Amino acid sequence: MSEHSHDNKPGELEESRLVVDNDFEVAPVNDRLFGSFVEHLGRCVYDGIYEPGHPEADEDGFRKDVIELVKELGATTIRYPGGNFVSGYRWEDGVGPRDERPRRLDLAWHSTETNQFGLHEMAKWLEKTGGNELMEAVNLGTRGLEEALDLLEYANIPGGTKLSEERRANGADQPFGIKMWCLGNEMDGPWQTGHKSAEDYGTLAASVAAGMRAIDPNVELVVCGSSSHVMDTFGKWEETVLEKTFDNVNFVSCHAYYHPELQPDGTRDMKSFLASGVDMDGFINDVAAAIDATKARLKSKHDVFISFDEWNVWYLNEEPSKNPEGIGNWPVAPRLLEDVYSAADAVVFGDLMITLLKNADRVHAASLAQLVNVIAPIMTEPGGPAWRQTTFYPFSLTAKLAKGGTVLEPKLASGTYETDKYGEVPTINSVAVRGEDGTISVFVVNRSMEAANDFAIKLPEGFALSAVEAQTLHEDDLLAKNTLEDQNRVVLHPNTTITSDADTGTVRVTLPPVSWTAVHVK
């Protein structure tokens, strides 16, 4: 539902309403929606999760302070090792004795890869972070079928073959049991090492999928969708690739990044940026339509879901994203893509999480790109501290409250506002999740830059309301950030405006302009 658009004077209070009904469900919340991504890029691995010699390093060189923050974040599935990096990666370089591992050029990020961290280290690190699931990507850029099958044999076969016995000799007696595999990365992107046409990639992915299933029928495979919604190849790529792979894959990937675009006058288009969830929602709907069209055309009974395995706010092509250059300049773990996120970025980030939850019937996996230092919720300094970026907070609280729950059909009445990029959009975006214990969690974002919003939640009939609480991320200074010098500048605060009426089953809370709020009702 949508109400008429109107311009607000600063300080004016808008109104919106969410009706929560237990009888209308979207889908269970898949734990994989709270995945993240570790790529050999910049300081994500080296000086990020792995820093031997750091005061907080354990016996394996893993930073214990980072491990604790990853646990607090609530990330689940971890996609690894790329990303663009994987399209030139030789997995066997990263196994075996460390002093025998080769140093290689990484063409994706113009860096040197030392290979001191590889598959075994990743598996061991994931055990320490709480047993997170590993989502492994195979190289379909410079490599193909044989190398992918070798990696699967090495990782998942218990023993008795050359490669499985090599794994055991390298210290992993039991197989890694990796279920989820990405068949390459962004293969329609001209920047991708080994970039391919849809025809060529679809044919290769189909053969790799069939071969992998011959080794391990229980693998879950992610085929590359187009690199983004705005690619010229988008749509036609999905149609061609899915036509060739449909019955042998489980997911098609989506990738999307958002930032406030610079205007000719030097300002940024904040109103459009704050509505980024609208674009993500349209992207998901378009990919779902491509899946459905292919399924109908093939008369298939098989279901393919979306793995939104790269999403975030990213100031793409701006200064922190510039690669090293020059034939003699291939640094190890340079500072790359180290965006420092603002309060406004965190609000948009929370909006994107709401959008993923609203589409939980189609999106069964998602990976926040990335986890540490590289466009990440966690930052570190070599030899120094680790801290939470602004985006850490909406992710961790959403994961805490939504895991194991069921998304309920959003019935939302909201005003609208005008944007240059997306036209008229709802001022409020919200979703409700019913927990396993029957409690209700509502996540809501106020996109308005001018007006606070009186947000009413109508609870399900017969809900025995006993307690309510709300936490809000909001700063009057939209550009406020958490930095090495001021690590807790932007945090969640209790929203003391929350009230409840058990007789009418209504909860009300005032949402400040440009804010993200989580309401928990029990």
UniProtKB/Swiss-Prot annotation:
InterPro entries: Alpha-L-AF_C (IPR010720), Glyco_hydro_b (IPR013780), Glycoside_hydrolase_SF (IPR017853)
Signal peptide stretch: none
Residues annotated as catalytic: E186, E310
UniProt site positions, description: Important for substrate recognition: W314, Q370
Catalytic activity: Hydrolysis of terminal non-reducing alpha-L-arabinofuranoside residues in alpha-L-arabinosides; (20S)-ginsenoside Rc + H2O = L-arabinofuranose + (20S)-ginsenoside Rd
GO BP of this protein: L-arabinose metabolic process; polysaccharide catabolic process
Residues where alpha-L-arabinofuranose binds: E39, N84, N185, Y257, E310, Q370
Record keywords: Carbohydrate metabolism, Glycosidase, Hydrolase
Activity regulation note: Completely inhibited by Cu(2+) and partially inhibited by Co(2+) and Ba(2+).
Temperature note: Optimum temperature is 57 degrees Celsius.
GO MF annotation: an example: alpha-L-arabinofuranosidase activity
Job of this protein: Catalyzes the hydrolysis of p-nitrophenyl-alpha-L-arabinofuranoside (pNP-alphaL-Af) and the hydrolysis of the terminal alpha-L-arabinofuranoside at the C20 position of ginsenoside Rc to produce ginsenoside Rd. Cannot hydrolyze p-nitrophenyl-alpha-L-arabinopyranoside (pNP-alphaL-Ap) and ginsenoside Rb2.
Family: Belongs to the glycosyl hydrolase 51 family.
Protein name: Exo-alpha-(1->6)-L-arabinofuranosidase
Originating organism: Bifidobacterium longum
